[in-house]
Regions:
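Asparagine/serine/threonine-enriched low-complexity, disordered tracts
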Residues: 22, 26, 32, 39, ...
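Short, ligand-facing micro-motifs at secondary-structure edges
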Residues: 8
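Non-catalytic interaction-recognition regions
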Residues: 13, 71-498
Length: 498
């Protein structure tokens, strides 16, 4: 659950409402500074009208109240991460993982149903190779000379699985080639435990884990469904799909000459299953290197009789992690990658989640872990948390609680105060925009701008002992509420003290 600080749907205020559309445009043009004098009256009227609802949210709000409140709620299946269960998650998976979890949180908050799913690729040759890699490594550790295949899995996680397999099956499992698939299945389950732990450590909890192997019973009826579309044909002993008719560079093989399904066949079955479950929209988050795969899958969805526009692919570009300006050291645990657990250990959950949605997904992301340790305005997480902590500090100095100032009139604020209130009240508009445009970086951008506006106002205005103390404290409570709400939707915790 997201906890306190979430505005109920009925009490969310957005700057796109008719009463304040013109004022919002002018405020945006002035960089969220004080409203121009010609807009002062309109801004004051808007904030006065909505201040009671917004301020009540400070002390009376929870996540469940926000559900089923969208004007046109969508039923969405969000599939993300879906890494092969052959090793721990690495930095290439982190960006999509953080984006997906944040997207699901925002969608649920806005009133949509966003179900999350991880597709386990457990039917391919890579699972058998995992078993072979473990068997060979176990024999090597026992002093045998072994010959590894050209491609195999290595790293400390392999060594960690070996004693677990030995305890379950005995040493003979590593020498009996007829049991390599049994070893592989065991290892796959152990790797999934590692993946689930890493995700939990990052605050990410997938609702459903869909096994490729479990869907194999749907292969034959799905292929028959495709054949009825007239878009399948046989050539060279293989069964092909005419994906080139819908934008793919060539037709694709679905069933090999030995009757084994291709990877594409498994994906077609899976996506037919998704739409049969009644989802209006299916969203997949993929690495940018899968861009060429989109056309063939959309073609298959179309041939299955679904509107292919209901399948949406969001691509995530690569991440380059630095330390002291140099490429971050690879992990021994995975052999040749920077692990998700490495990133968590280096910068912590909050910093990781913030940074990994701080840029558009289609833009490459590069950052230095040392910059996130700085305690100044160059570190956005510190700067935003400092704003939230300052609010708590000034309430303590005034000897008051947020609930004590809810009755204060925002109409007593000057133009600068109204400008800050207007900025804080813009959160819901930002959330809708970020969700609908898929540009989640708009949320950290909003927080950075709000924190800058707050610190400027804080430094230029006396609060405790001033004529309009309660109105200013109520304004600060609203800013803190917006920060807490946004942080909760990003999977972060706002600091009370710093």
């Amino acid at each position: 659950e997201l906890g306190c600080g979430i505005l109920p749907a009925s009490e969310r205020i957005c700057a796109s409402e008719p009463a304040c559309k013109d004022s919002a445009a002018n405020l945006a043009a002035s960089g969220n500074d004080a409203a121009k004098s010609q807009n002062f009256a309109a801004s004051q009227n808007f904030i006065s009208q909505n201040s009671e609802e917004a301020s009540n949210s400070v002390v009376a709000s929870n996540y469940d109240e926000a559900r089923n409140s969208a004007a046109m709620p969508q039923k969405i299946l969000l599939e993300y991460i879906s890494a092969n269960p052959t090793g721990p998650l690495h930095i290439g998976h982190v960006r999509g993982a953080v984006y997906g979890d944040t997207f699901a949180r925002i969608g649920g908050y806005l009133g949509h149903r966003v179900d999350t799913e991880y597709y386990i690729n457990d039917a391919g040759n890579q699972i058998e190779l995992l078993g072979t890699s473990i068997a060979l490594r176990a024999r090597e550790l026992a002093g045998e000379d072994v010959s590894y295949p050209e491609k195999y899995y290595r790293g400390e996680y392999i060594d960690e699985i070996i004693p677990l397999a030995r305890a379950q099956f005995g040493d003979e499992i590593f020498r009996d080639e007829s049991r390599v698939l049994i070893l592989a299945e065991f290892a796959k389950d152990e790797v999934l435990k590692i993946i689930q732990k890493d995700l939990a450590d990052a605050g990410i909890h997938i609702q459903n884990w869909a096994s490729e192997k479990s869907l194999y019973g749907e292969l034959e009826p799905t292929i028959r469904k495709l054949e009825r579309s007239g878009k399948m044909y046989e050539a060279e002993g293989k069964i092909w799909i005419r994906s080139s008719q819908l934008g793919d560079e060539k037709d694709r093989v679905v069933i090999r000459e030995d009757a084994r399904p291709t990877y594409l066949a498994g994906d077609i079955v899976y996506h037919n299953n998704k739409f049969e479950r009644g989802y209006e929209r299916c969203i997949n988050i993929w690495g940018a290197d899968h861009h060429g795969y989109i056309a063939r899958l959309k073609a298959a969805v179309h041939f299955l009789g679904y509107d292919e526009s209901r399948l949406e692919i969001i691509l995530m570009q690569m991440v380059n992690l630095l330390k002291d300006g140099q490429t971050y050291k690879m992990s021994k645990r995975a052999g040749n990658a920077i692990l998700m657990s490495d990133v968590l250990a280096a910068i912590g959950r909050d910093a990781m989640r913030f940074i990994f949605i701080s840029k558009k997904g289609e833009t490459p992301l590069e950052f230095d872990v040392d910059e996130l340790a700085r305690e100044d305005s160059s570190n956005p997480i510190f700067y935003i948390n400092y704003a939230h902590a300052r609010v708590n500090q000034i309430f303590a100095k005034a000897g008051k609680r947020e609930a004590d100032v809810l009755g204060a009139d925002f109409g007593a604020l000057d133009e600068a105060g109204l400008g800050l209130a207007f900025a804080a009240l813009g959160l819901n508009e930002i959330l809708n925009d970020a969700f609908n445009s898929r540009g989640l970086q708009k949320l950290p951008d909003f927080l950075k701008a709000l924190a800058a506006d707050f610190h400027k106002y804080y430094n230029e205005n006396r609060v405790v002992g001033s004529e309009n103390e309660d109105a200013k404290l109520k304004l600060f409570a609203l800013v803190a509420l917006s920060i807490r709400t946004a942080f909760a939707l990003m999977g972060l915790s706002a600091k009370e003290k710093m």
